[in-house]
Amino acid sequence: MQLTPPEVEK
């Protein structure tokens, strides 16, 4: 599962 910048905000 790759985390993109927007998802890293979680």
From Swiss-Prot:
GO terms for cellular component: cytoplasm. Its main location: cytoplasm. It is found in: Cytoplasm. It comes from Morganella morganii. Keywords: Cytoplasm, Hydrolase. The keyword Cytoplasm applies. Heterotrimer of UreA (gamma), UreB (beta) and UreC (alpha) subunits. Three heterotrimers associate to form the active enzyme. GO terms for biological process: urea catabolic process. It catalyses: urea + 2 H2O + H(+) = hydrogencarbonate + 2 NH4(+). The keyword Disulfide bond does not apply. Its EC number is 3.5.1.5. Pathway: Nitrogen metabolism; urea degradation; CO(2) and NH(3) from urea (urease route): step 1/1. This is Urease subunit gamma. GO terms for molecular function: urease activity.
